[in-house]
């Protein structure tokens, strides 16, 4: 058995789940990207680093980096072309400590960031409120639709149940 080298990751994605609009989650296939695969895409495609530099930054060989990058790109292309959801999770990586997490204060709408390895803030640095939430990470962004998890048949049956209970009143 070959020991897989843990990749160094310096940034976590702000959101970990993407899906096509108006298709219930239960009706979708999911493409799974690991944290290190998304890091390879970030370094090469977003930051436009050369392959050598990106591989060095992740602590792996150029060949390994290229394999990770190609695998990640193939998964993203498959999801986009074939209407699949994309989930980003798991993998074998080491956090380099450069990762930052964003927080939101529900009281004053102030957004700030903290290093990943720091303890969670207890209050907003702007207004002192303790109504703070971590942004990203759970896949539920501002446009999250709560009822999007059920299939169309379930929606219809729940609607008819609701309508039936309204008529009885």
Curated annotation (Swiss-Prot):
Disulfide bonds: none annotated. It holds the Pfam family DUF134. SUPFAM superfamilies: Sigma3 and sigma4 domains of RNA polymerase sigma factors. PANTHER family: PTHR37478, UPF0251 PROTEIN TK0562. HAMAP family: UPF0251 (MF_00674). Belongs to the UPF0251 family. This is UPF0251 protein MM_2090.
């Amino acid at each position: 058995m070959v020991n897989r080298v843990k990749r160094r990751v310096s940034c976590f994605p702000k959101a970990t789940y993407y899906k096509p609009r108006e298709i219930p989650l239960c009706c979708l296939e999911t493409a799974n990207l690991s944290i290190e695969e998304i890091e390879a895409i970030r370094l090469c495609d977003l930051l436009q680093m050369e392959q050598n530099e990106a591989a060095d930054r992740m602590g792996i060989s150029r060949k390994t980096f290229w394999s990770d990058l190609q695998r990640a790109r193939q998964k993203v292309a498959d999801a986009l072309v074939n209407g699949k959801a994309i989930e980003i999770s798991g993998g074998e990586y080491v956090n380099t400590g450069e990762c930052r997490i964003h927080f939101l204060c529900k009281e004053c709408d102030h957004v700030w960031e903290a290093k990943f390895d720091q303890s969670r803030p207890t209050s907003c640095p702007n207004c002192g409120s303790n109504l703070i939430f971590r942004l990203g990470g759970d896949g539920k962004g501002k446009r999250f639709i709560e009822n999007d998890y059920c299939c169309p048949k379930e929606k219809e049956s729940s609607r008819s149940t609701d309508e039936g209970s309204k008529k009885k009143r």
